[in-house]
Structures are given as C-alpha cells and as structure tokens.
Amino acid sequence: MSQDAAIAEQTPVEHLSAVDSASHSVLSTPSNKAERDEIKAYGEGEEHEPVVEIPKRPASAYVTVSIMCIMIAFGGFVFGWDTGTISGFINQTDFIRRFGMKHKDGTNYLSKVRTGLIVSIFNIGCAIGGIILSKLGDMYGRKVGLIVVVVIYIIGIIIQIASINKWYQYFIGRIISGLGVGGIAVLSPMLISEVSPKHLRGTLVSCYQLMITAGIFLGYCTNFGTKNYSNSVQWRVPLGLCFAWALFMIGGMTFVPESPRYLAEVGKIEEAKRSIAVSNKVAVDDPSVLAEVEAVLAGVEAEKLAGNASWGELFSSKTKVLQRLIMGAMIQSLQQLTGDNYFFYYGTTIFKAVGLSDSFETSIVLGIVNFASTFVGIYVVERYGRRTCLLWGAASMTACMVVYASVGVTRLWPNGQDQPSSKGAGNCMIVFACFYIFCFATTWAPIPYVVVSETFPLRVKSKAMSIATAANWLWGFLIGFFTPFITGAINFYYGYVFMGCLVFMFFYVLLVVPETKGLTLEEVNTMWEEGVLPWKSASWVPPSRRGANYDAEEMAHDDKPLYKRMFSTK
C-alpha cells in the first residue's frame, strides 16, 4: 500500500466529526497533520522560491473536464426548458380551456392574475429551494445534493402532467418543480466553479447559462411543434420530455468529480488531490496539485478554527461577507431587471401585439439568437473579464431598449391601438429585440452566475449563494406576475422602466463589482479581505506573486474624484 493510500485510510469522516465537535481543526489530527506536512513540503522551500502553480496545457487536454462541467451545467437546461415552454403554454388552446375561465360568450381565457401566478410562482419555488435545498451540498456533497434536487424537480413535473382541469394542481406542481430548480441553480454553478481550472472557470461556469439558452430555444421549438394539436399533447409532451432531461443529468453526475473543496472540508484529502488532478489533467503527485491542495486546506483550516458558519455571519462586515452578499444579491437582481424575462416569458404574447401572424415562429428566432450569442459570452468572459463585459453589456442593452420602447410607443400604432399595427415598426422592434438578446446573452446572462460562484468564502458559500440567487428568483416572480398588468396599463412604455434599470446597472458595476478574471477562489477571497477598490481590481496582484515594490495599501485607497476616474486616459 502506498503512503498516500495509507494516509487516506487514516482520515475517516467519523473522526473528522469528533474533531469538529471539540472545536479543533480538521487538520489538527495526527493523520491529517501528516498529510498536511507532506503537502507543505512541496510548497515550502527557500524564502524566495516561486509558488508552484498548475501549468496551462493545450486546449485538447481540457476536453474531459469541459464535458464533465457541461454535464453539471445541464441543470441550466432544465430551467431554460421551463422558461421556453411556459411562454407557449399560456397561449395554447387546450391549456387555456383546462386551466382558464370562460367569458359570457363561452370563449375561454386566462385572466391576468391567473396567468401571472402560473408563470411566476415557479420563481417563488426556486427562491425557497435555493435557500433550503442548497444546504444539501454542504451536508452530503455537491453531487449528491444535485441528484436529490433533480428528483424533487421530477415530482413537481409529475404533478403538473397529472393535472386535468384544476389550475391550482398545476400551480402546486410548478412550486414543487421550482424547489428543485432553485437547488440546481445554486449547486450547479457552485460545483463547476470548484472543479474547473482557474483559467477556464469563467468559461465553464458560463456553460450553465449556455444550457439555459439551449433549454429556452428547444422549449420554443417544442411548443411550435405541438401547437397544432387540439388536445393535451400541446403541453403534456413538452412536460413529459422533462423526465429525459432529469435522467440525463442524474446519469451525468456519476462521471463528474466531487468538489475538492468539499472533500478537503470533510477530511478526504486523497480524494481532493485526485479531483484536482483529474480536472487539471496532471498526475496526482504533481507538485502543483499538492500546492493547490495546500492552499485549499489552509482556507478550510482557518474556517474550521472559526467554528460553524451561521446565517447571522452573512451580515457581518468583518471579512467583507456582508459587502459580498449585497453585491451578489444586487448582481442577480439586476440580471432580472435587464428585462430579459419580459421577452422570454411573454415573447409569444409580445409578438402578437406587433401584428405577427405566427408569434411562435418569432419566439424561435429569439431563442436562436439567445443560444448562439451565449457562445460569444463564453469566450468574452475570460478574454475581457467580468467587469468590462458587464459594463459594455449594460451600455449596449440601454441603447437597444431605448429604440425598442420608442418605436413601440410612437410608431407601432400610427392610427391608434384599435387599428392595424405598422409592419415596418413591428419589424424594427423585432430586430432590436434580437440585438438586445445578443447583448444580454453575451454579458449579463452568464456573468452574474460566474461572479456569484467565485465571490464567497467556502464556509458561507452555499448560504450566501442561495440568498443571492433567491434575489434573482424574487425579481423573476415580480416581473413574471406584474408584467401582464403593467403592459396592459402602459404597454411599450414598460421598456423605459428597464432602460432606467440598465443605466443604474452601469454605474453600480463601475463602482462596486471587482474584476476576478484569472484568480483562484482563495485569491478572490484575499482580494475582498484586503478591501481592494473595484476600479483598481484588474491591477491587483495576489500575495504569492507580488514583488518587493508592490503597494497593497494603494489598491484600497483612491483620492481621485469619480469624474476623473471615469474619463481618465491613464
């Protein structure tokens, strides 16, 4: 038996629990101390010896880890599928007949209240599931946690399919499936961020958003394929396909590595080393792997010594956790306030308003643009950084929304809303809606998930991510529920509301959101603790790579006025 194997056998989880209960570090046990000493031997040497980092390899070397992360990211497809299909369901005749009401003349319709509830209650389930079920990732591991929440999602789908003519049964099913998707939305980006190589982390976490867009697009296509049926095939077939997506994800979990940070936290040091080695395509005993494990263990040990994390700790400013939580919740909230779900939830309804004969087809066009554009987003997030992309995204979406709303308000109905709409104005609105979707899909669609997944320290990560993601779901509910009422009252003036939010987003990112491109999760944590100013964060250097003349204090202070910061050429 090798020395590594012998050490691994001496670190049982039961012993870890006993140590934790006595308020000692997981690394203070003799066996784990030996493991730690072995690892530190590779990271320590002469005082000026550079830190050993995992080397970058050719792109072909990362095919395996990329495929594994795509399997994890498939949870986003589940969410996207719901978004794409529900927008069509509320316009399908059989769905309206079963779950709607009747006018005095006998025609069926869905009231604005019922439409808003059916569409948006899913988000409330997601918010609750994200907060409650994300804890499974800390208790049983990210992989097991994902499998459990997918099973909960399936239960909700079964209830929806079994609904015959009671809208509240379908309503309850959407809440339960939302619980599962809420857990997925926290655990999927979390696991991807923890297993992916640092120089690919932004790209691979963005795959979660890519899967969302794929789900939306294929959901639109499925609605288009079933719209000509006159029975429940219209909506039950798209729901039935959810079983295939769920089973694919559960099967994929058997092939992906567990989070090395979770494994280190529960004392499985050897497995943590293997996870890092697999993800980075290097040997388990490579010095760079041992150095990486050492960095993870140092963070875990510090968190263990501090005791169990409580919900109250999220509101402490001691280690900048509160500031990070506010930033994460704001970024996720602002993603919804871009107005994306105004198009995705009600796209079919919107394009009916601009006079299209088949609004289902136009929804497919939006879905194609959304899906294809996300590939660009996967590239730019690592090429240009999180902060730069968010700034450009907010500016470009503002321009698109101004044109879209202005044409809708001033040109769509030249002779009044009771008269036919202008075809030219309608086409212009569709074009700028596509431009808007392109700008959103390349920036604000994937990057909030990236930023939130790499912002929080391990000890509060699941709690903080669940709160931040819950903010996204809450705003999704509000937009989904109130949009029918708002558009009924002010129509395309609604676009100006989103335009105002987009302007605010630009300045919020400029002043609050730091750049984290190319940093390990531990380095991101250090940057926050040092209080680095967001507009200086792109120039920040981790302690392990600093020269003798580096001034860390200067990164946390700036006497230059705001207007000079914004327009300075230096």
UniProtKB/Swiss-Prot annotation:
Cellular localisation: Membrane
Gene Ontology CC annotations of this record: cell periphery; mitochondrial membrane; mitochondrion; plasma membrane
Keywords (A to Z) from UniProt: Glycoprotein, Isopeptide bond, Membrane, Repeat, Sugar transport, Transmembrane, Transmembrane helix, Transport, Ubl conjugation
Residues bearing glycans: 91, 228
Predominant location category: membrane
GO molecular function, one term: D-glucose transmembrane transporter activity
Gene3D superfamilies cross-referenced by the UniProt entry: MFS general substrate transporter like domains
Domain of life, source organism: Eukaryota
Pfam family membership, one: Sugar_tr
Function (record text): High-affinity glucose transporter.
Stated name of the protein: High-affinity hexose transporter HXT6
Gene: HXT6
